[in-house]
């Protein structure tokens, strides 16, 4: 009612903001409604001012420039340097938005709509957006474009921020830096204007003549006050609905132009008239009625605008309706409430009433002393003013005669510039009642909302309640009128949503049915197009087998078949042929337990094939699949069986009954009925054909090795057996633990086959050293120094001036006294005892192997014994290293020796040579891994040298990755290796470990499924639709712990491979299931391929699976660190290794072997490790290309190794982040005052604080940012190994769940990684995530699709490369 009136110097936007803010102060106290209450806070209102008290003046403070925020968090964030800012070039930003919008147009599929949407929820969403001060049209566009696609409030905000221009965004959302004052609302408001704000209850006042004590105001001031009153009235009429619901922002008020608004309304009015005329012609009464309502609404608002003080009369338009129709006269109750807000002068009001001759509202408010003993309203008002306004004079009462009735004008001076004047329109029969009624109305205005009316006489109490009820009704009517367009829009939108929801429910069964079908060309086809054709065996019948049977009979009659048949008959397994075949006819599952060398791997599949082809009865299938754990086994066994069958064309030839299939290589034909394949190939076949419909017999060989793939395959086969009664399963194992497999398959029969072996004499390390005369030098690389780790110490150095400087140094710490020697070794020489005590058991002594080989040829005991030497080594690197030593040692130059390396990555010719007998007088030396334990048999081996080491897949909790680590073998494996020496005659086994160590070996190796991460297994389970991984793996032979499975699923969710709430693969997960590598490495490789940098990424991935090529010799740590620092690049250990690799390749190409060796020595690099990196890199690249991805020709086309450019580094760091996330931490930058002082880099990770390892190039890094790390290890403290400094873009593009905090201008990743960003940029990154998923989905649907010219990838690549450039 009454408002504060203060002199203004000039009308303007600030005054408008001040006045409107005053009119809304009370509504601001209620807060925003709906989701805005909890999720997106709006600005806090000013504290309420007690009635009658003066408002405190806001103290002028220093101006602060920052991104405008709705609360303190945003501002504080801007002051925190550790929260990095994200900025995109303006032109690039516009292009990215164009790509996003284009993608949305092309992919306009509507998402699932929530069935719980209601009009109330839509209204809450509408009002929440309205509370953010978005315009009505923008709100409606946003809701239409997002809710119909399954969106919510966040989706609508994202749409608005992405599609509105910066100047169209409300305050707090725009991208520009804005000026703000602490705790000021509205912004940029001067102290003088703020002081004029009136309390919420005084927004409806009537200006009367001034008190003589108050100085008369100038005409200019009156105009300004009129402007303020007009704004208050307009705000009241337009925004009545906001009372009690929430405060609205000031964007529209700050930019309000009545003339522009008037012209807009005039245009809309003309449109509405044309629409009404059209409806009239169409006789559409409903449409005509709606159009008339619009016309009336526009006209009312235009009339209001015409009263604006700065309205330009030149643009005023005359319309008939405006001239004819006048606003309806207010009711007496409304007049009594003075709800018109802006009454004209008393004289004008009486004159108007006189003209209209309206009947007066005359009432009697008399009450007796008996009915009321309290104060009268007049006395109550006087006492209230004295108490609450002690500096103000007593209220004045001016009686006004209206005919024979009375009313009273009451005047209350609240302050020098604030006078409340009220005059009720209700008339009384005497002057005293009029004074009491005026006092009641004054109290109603002064203490509105309080229960003062209970202290008044009953008659005045009733009129008070009457006023209150009428005011509420009026507010409700105004609210309904104002909200009518909104409610109409919500009703239409809700109707559309329900219609779309019904359509989705009708289409869902069809889509689910279609979704179960495999795409026409699925991703498995690109594992190897021809490979899967080999496993896609055609269904066979008796007629189909006729040509094959005829072929087999022809082969049986060949001399080659008959000659090899005699050799087969000498094998131990051959005499069990009939029992094996008969048992298989009676039982569907059989376990064949045979010793190594019994011939089971070649003969059991051969027996089955012969029986099925020679059996003329029935029309049984004949498609046999025999799985092998290694590729070399599959190839060599298939080759041998082909020879035994008499096939001249070899495996997979035109007239061959036997073939093989390994990764990226297939040898099979139409006549193939026996297929040897790796376990992984059959698992991929199961992803395509879950029941193996075309297979009649499955033979799983080497099940005793308990690889994770074979255990997984057994679970699937056990379930298939319950669904297919015609499938037969044969498990072939060494004699170890065969009963366990029988029990797993409901106590199926076991056929035990003895082996053919001769006695083997065993020599242990102590015997070998004693006999060969080997001397272990103290400076030898194989001599144990008992060094465990380096300890960090702090040294205080006092300078001449008395200052103290601290230095951090690392000194080697010994583990203590040397271990005591077992008394058992006292019988050996002191030289042997010294060797046993100090020889490093964890390092293979290649020098000792050379001495032993020489000893075999020189000692009288062995030099006359013919036979091959089989050396068991842990991996390819050791094979290559020993091969190089033998090749360069002149003692082995002569033709007396034939050195053969046996490994699955080597050529087929080299592998074939291992199985051939050498010429007489030539000693064959075969270097092999544990594949020679049981997988293959080299027929002429007499000597076995067992290093006792093997490589096992092991999970590292520190890096959440698995890798092949070197470890000791089990007793069972050692005995298998020993047995290889006794196949043709009495043999000899030389163990390069002591007898005491052998006794400490485990009896059996731990099943792989219990010691490796299960991410890859979970991917296969979900890919094959086998249900929940937890439920499926509980059926395994040795079920892993639920926590391990849960960890695997959590990691898959983190990297985006499966859906967050169900065991279902995402597009990325579908691709990762096609790569038999660790999921983190797989993700790196996929992103490396799609961003055109597969070669360097494959090298980085190889580094993660193998050990670092950098070495630190004892006593040369400083030199090694200096050499590593010279190769350091881009604050990254990973890129430093790649830089070293590039230098090695360059030296290799330019200077040959000598230059290569010199480069490695100069930079402290292990050449063997670099060779291993090269081999693993090539293998990984083959895997990725086989899965349908190819690297960019531009990168592969580079001539020779080149230095990394800035753009290359940015791209490689982004791909590293894609693979290693969430192994990331925030650098706790603590810059020292002394520039020479080096502080260790401290990092805050999600699990706590850690320190960068001393071996890292980032050890002394001190800057704000985020650090990727490969591994987290705990020594005396927690260290991060292999780290890389990354920028915000990679984290935002490839990190965890991203959330946009619109008002705070913050981006959060996984709820703890924060970046500052204008809201539009924040939404861009959120949308780019969706685009990356869409690219992967398209690639999944069409594996042959080229990604080289994809617009989405091009724009993302450009974005990454231009960061900070």
UniProtKB/Swiss-Prot annotation:
InterPro entries: DEAD-box_helicase_OB_fold, DEAD/DEAH_box_helicase_dom, DHX29, DNA/RNA_helicase_DEAH_CS, DSRM_DHX29, HA2_WH, Helicase-assoc_dom, Helicase_ATP-bd. This is ATP-dependent RNA helicase DHX29. Its EC number is 3.6.4.13. Residues 206-222 have a biased composition (Basic and acidic residues). It catalyses: ATP + H2O = ADP + phosphate + H(+). It comes from the Eukaryota. Keywords: ATP-binding, Coiled coil, Cytoplasm, Helicase, Hydrolase, Initiation factor, Nucleotide-binding, Phosphoprotein, Protein biosynthesis. It holds the Pfam family DEAD. Residues 187-203 have a biased composition (Polar residues). It comes from Mus musculus. Residues 1-74, 174-222, 235-257, 500-524 are annotated as: Disordered. The keyword Cytoplasm applies.
């Amino acid at each position: 009612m009454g408002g504060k009136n203060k002199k203004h110097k000039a009308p303007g936007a600030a005054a408008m903001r001040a006045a409107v803010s005053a009119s809304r102060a009370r509504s601001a106290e209620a807060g925003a409604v709906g989701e805005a209450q909890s999720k997106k806070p709006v600005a806090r209102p000013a504290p309420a001012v007690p009635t009658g008290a003066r408002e405190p003046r806001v103290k002028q403070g220093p101006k602060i420039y920052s991104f405008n925020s709705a609360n303190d968090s945003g501002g504080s964030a801007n002051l925190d340097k550790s929260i990095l800012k994200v900025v995109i070039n303006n032109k690039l930003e516009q292009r990215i938005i164009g790509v996003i919008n284009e993608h949305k147009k092309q992919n306009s599929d509507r998402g699932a709509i929530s069935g719980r949407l209601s009009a109330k929820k839509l209204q809450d969403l509408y009002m929440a957006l309205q509370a953010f001060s978005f315009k009505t049209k923008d709100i409606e566009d946003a809701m239409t474009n997002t809710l119909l696609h399954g969106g919510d409030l966040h989706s609508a905000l994202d749409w608005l921020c992405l599609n509105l221009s910066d100047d169209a965004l409300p305050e707090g959302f725009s991208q520009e830096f804005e000026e703000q004052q602490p705790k000021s609302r509205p912004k940029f408001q001067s102290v003088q204007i703020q002081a004029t704000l009136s309390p919420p209850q005084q927004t409806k006042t009537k200006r009367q003549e001034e008190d003589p004590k108050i100085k008369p105001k100038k005409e200019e001031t009156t105009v300004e006050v009129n402007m303020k009153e007009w704004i208050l009235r307009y705000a009241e009429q337009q925004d009545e609905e906001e009372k009690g619901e929430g405060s609205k922002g000031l964007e529209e008020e700050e930019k309000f132009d009545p003339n522009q608004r008037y012209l807009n309304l005039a245009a809309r009015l003309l449109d509405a008239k044309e629409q009404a005329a059209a409806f009239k012609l169409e006789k559409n009464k409903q449409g005509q009625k709606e159009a008339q309502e619009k016309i009336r609404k526009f006209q009312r608002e235009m009339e209001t605008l015409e009263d604006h003080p700065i309205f330009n009369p030149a643009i005023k338009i005359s319309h008939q309706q405006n001239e004819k129709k006048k606003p309806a006269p207010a009711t007496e109750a409304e007049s009594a409430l003075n709800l018109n807000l802006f009454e004209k002068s008393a004289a004008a009001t009486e004159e108007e009433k006189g003209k209209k001759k309206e009947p007066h509202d005359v009432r009697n408010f008399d009450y007796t002393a008996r009915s009321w003993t309290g104060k009268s309203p007049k006395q109550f008002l006087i006492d209230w003013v004295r108490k609450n306004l002690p500096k103000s004079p007593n209220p004045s009462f001016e009686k006004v005669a209206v005919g024979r009735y009375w009313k009273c004008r009451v005047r209350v001076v609240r302050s020098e510039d604030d006078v409340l004047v009220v005059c009720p329109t209700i008339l009384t029969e005497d002057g005293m009642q009029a004074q009491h009624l005026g006092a009641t109305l004054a109290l109603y205005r002064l203490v509105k909302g309080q229960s003062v009316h209970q202290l008044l006489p009953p008659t005045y109490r009733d009129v008070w309640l009457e006023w209150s009820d009428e005011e509420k009704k009026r507010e409700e009517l105004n609210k309904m009128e104002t909200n009518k367009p909104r409610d109409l829009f919500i009703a239409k939108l809700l109707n559309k949503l329900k219609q779309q929801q019904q359509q989705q429910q009708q289409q869902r069964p069809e889509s689910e049915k279609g979704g179960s079908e495999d795409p026409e060309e699925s991703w498995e086809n690109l594992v190897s197009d021809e490979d899967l054709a080999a496993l896609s065996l055609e269904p066979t019948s008796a007629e189909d087998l006729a040509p094959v049977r005829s072929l087999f009979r022809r082969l049986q009659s060949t001399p080659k078949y008959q000659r090899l048949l005699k050799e087969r008959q000498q094998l131990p397994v051959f005499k069990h042929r009939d029992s094996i075949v008969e048992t298989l006819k009676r039982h569907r599952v059989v376990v064949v337990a045979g010793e190594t060398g019994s011939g089971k791997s070649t003969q059991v599949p051969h027996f089955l094939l012969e029986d099925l082809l020679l059996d003329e009865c029935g029309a049984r299938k004949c498609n046999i699949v025999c799985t092998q754990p290694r590729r070399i086994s599959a190839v060599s066994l298939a080759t041998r069986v082909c020879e035994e069958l008499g096939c001249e064309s070899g495996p997979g030839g035109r007239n061959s009954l036997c073939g093989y299939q390994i990764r990226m290589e297939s040898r099979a034909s139409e006549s193939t009925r026996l297929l040897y394949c790796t376990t992984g190939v059959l698992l991929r076949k199961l992803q395509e054909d879950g029941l193996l419909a075309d297979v009649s017999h499955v033979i799983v060989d080497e099940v005793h090795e308990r690889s994770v793939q074979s255990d997984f395959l057994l679970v699937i086969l056990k379930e298939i057996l319950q669904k297919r009664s015609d499938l037969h399963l044969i498990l072939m194992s060494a004699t170890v633990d065969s009963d366990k497999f029988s029990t797993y398959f409901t106590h199926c029969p076991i056929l035990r086959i003895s082996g053919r072996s001769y006695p083997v004499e065993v020599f242990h390390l102590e015997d070998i050293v004693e006999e060969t005369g080997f001397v272990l030098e103290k400076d030898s690389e194989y001599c144990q120094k008992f060094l465990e780790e380096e300890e960090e110490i702090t040294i205080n150095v006092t300078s001449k001036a008395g200052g103290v400087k601290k230095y951090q140094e690392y000194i080697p710490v010994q583990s203590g006294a040397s271990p005591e020697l077992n008394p058992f070794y006292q019988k050996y020489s002191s030289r042997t005892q010294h060797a046993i005590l100090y020889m490093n058991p964890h390092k293979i002594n290649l020098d000792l192997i050379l001495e032993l080989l020489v000893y075999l040829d020189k000692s009288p005991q062995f030099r006359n014994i013919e036979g091959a030497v089989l050396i068991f080594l842990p991996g390819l690197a050791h094979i290559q290293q020993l091969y190089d030593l033998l090749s360069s040692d002149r003692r082995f130059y002569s033709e007396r020796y034939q050195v053969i390396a046996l490994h699955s990555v080597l050529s087929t010719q080299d592998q074939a040579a291992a199985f051939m007998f050498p010429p007489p007088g030539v000693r064959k030396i075969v270097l092999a891994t544990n594949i020679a334990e049981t997988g293959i048999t080299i027929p002429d081996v007499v000597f076995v040298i067992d290093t006792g080491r093997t490589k096992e897949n092991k999970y590292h909790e520190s890096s959440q990755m698995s890798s092949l680590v070197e470890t000791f073998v089990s007793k069972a494996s050692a005995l298998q290796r020993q047995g290889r020496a006794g196949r043709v005659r009495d043999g000899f086994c030389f163990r390069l470990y002591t007898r005491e160590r052998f006794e400490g070996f485990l009896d059996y190796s731990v099943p792989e499924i219990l010691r490796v991460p299960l991410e890859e297994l979970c991917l296969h389970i979900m890919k094959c639709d086998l249900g929940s991984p937890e439920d499926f793996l509980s059926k395994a032979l040795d079920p892993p712990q639920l926590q391990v499975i849960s960890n695997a699923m959590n990691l898959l969710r983190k990297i985006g491979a499966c859906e967050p709430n169900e065991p279902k693969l995402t597009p990325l997960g579908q691709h990762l299931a096609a790569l038999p590598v660790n999921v983190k490495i797989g993700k790196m490789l996929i992103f490396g391929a799609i961003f055109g940098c597969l070669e360097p990424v494959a090298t980085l991935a190889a580094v993660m699976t193998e050990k670092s090529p950098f070495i630190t010799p004892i006593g040369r740590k400083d030199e090694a660190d200096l050499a590593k620092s010279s190769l350091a690049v881009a604050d990254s250990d990973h890129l430093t290794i790649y830089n070293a690799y590039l230098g090695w390749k360059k030296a290799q190409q330019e200077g040959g072997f000598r230059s290569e060796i010199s480069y490695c020595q100069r930079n402290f690099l292990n050449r063997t490790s670099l060779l291993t990196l090269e081999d693993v890199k090539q293998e990984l690249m083959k895997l990725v290309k086989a899965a349908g991805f190819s690297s960019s020709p531009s990168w592969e086309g580079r001539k020779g190794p080149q230095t990394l450019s800035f753009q290359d580094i940015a791209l490689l760091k982004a791909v590293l982040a894609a693979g290693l996330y969430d192994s990331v931490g925030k650098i706790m930058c603590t810059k020292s005052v002394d520039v020479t002082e080096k502080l260790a880099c401290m990092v805050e990770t999600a699990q706590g604080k850690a320190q960068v390892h001393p071996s890292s190039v980032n050890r002394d890094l001190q800057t704000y940012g985020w650090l990727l790390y490969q591994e987290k290890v705990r020594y005396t403290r927690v260290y991060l190994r292999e780290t890389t400094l990354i920028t915000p873009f990679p984290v935002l593009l490839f990190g965890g769940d991203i959330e946009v905090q619109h008002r705070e201008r913050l981006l959060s990743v996984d709820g703890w990684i924060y970046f500052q960003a204008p809201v539009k940029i924040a939404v861009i990154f959120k949308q780019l995530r969706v685009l990356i998923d869409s690219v992967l989905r398209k690639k999944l649907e069409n594996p042959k699709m080229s990604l080289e010219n994809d617009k989405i990838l091009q724009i993302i690549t450009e974005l990454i490369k231009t960061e900070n450039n």
